[in-house]
Swiss-Prot record:
Keywords: Cytoplasm, Heme biosynthesis, Iron, Lyase, Metal-binding, Porphyrin biosynthesis. Its EC number is 4.98.1.1. Pathway: Porphyrin-containing compound metabolism; protoheme biosynthesis; protoheme from protoporphyrin-IX: step 1/1. This is Ferrochelatase. The keyword Iron applies. Its main location: cytoplasm. Catalyzes the ferrous insertion into protoporphyrin IX. NCBIfam families: hemH. Belongs to the ferrochelatase family. Monomer. Fe cation binds at residues 194, 275. PANTHER family: FERROCHELATASE, FERROCHELATASE, MITOCHONDRIAL. One of its GO terms (biological process) is heme biosynthetic process.
Amino acid sequence: MRQTKTGILLANLGTPDAPTPEAVKRYLKQFLSDRRVVDTPRPLWWPLLRGVILPLRSPRVAKLYQSIWMDGGSPLMVYSREQQQGLAARLPDTPVALGMSYGSPSLESAVDELLASDVDHIVVLPLYPQYSCSTVGAVWDELGRILARKRRIPGISFIRDYADDGAYIDALAKSARESFARHGEPDLLLLSYHGIPQRYADEGDDYPQRCRDTTRELVSALGLPPEKVMMTFQSRFGREPWLTPYTDETLKMLGEKGTGHIQVMCPGFAADCLETLEEIAEQNREIFLEAGGKKYAYIPALNATPEHIDMMLKLTAPYR
């Protein structure tokens, strides 16, 4: 009997190819055209997207990307490649491909790369610790579209999420402890997750619960009293209500109340990106300090740390 050959597909959101208005516009157009991300009826959404959002946001967002761009590209791409290489180094007989929902390398190019390596089973690991229809669901949808065009369909193992996985929680806890050792233990640890529209949760997306699961397990692992930890949601977009409390408003309130020392971690981001390095580490830091806060530190994402690679090994092990 022929032995199954397995490959691993690491999936993430994506990034512009360059910190220019043109590249950002291409990326945002693809991202904001996905019904999993914005489900506004298309006759209403297309004119708004093409006539208002893309022309206005692309130059502004490009400037933000310029402030965090690295020699090897956007931080998300640099760290994602390091994750791919780190996992591949630990699994020399298992092909590991990287694919993005938007931009390049695409999910289709990752599937093609694995099929070219003659795999007949693919383990798909979306690097979103907490399931949401707008992230993990988008990977699932695109994977279905890709495979619908193939004559040869491999076996698929799809890891839905890992919000309360022990190796993931241990990696987060180690990162937090290292930050506490470097900056001192904070008055408050703020756990900021990417937001989604409240309506998505009302319609059945269990993302808020999965965020609560991560928070509960991390607080337990750190041994912190509940009053020293807060959970908030960032990066809201548009006018409809999103999950609350909002990170920026909470930081302003905490600064005004006289909270002295805050450290912020973003457990939902597997790799540092615009939303962590610019929005959290810079914009929200200014909000807190200008409101009266004294000390603010951002705890980096897990990126390609050995603990993060260990977690990927453990998550994929049952399917290899």
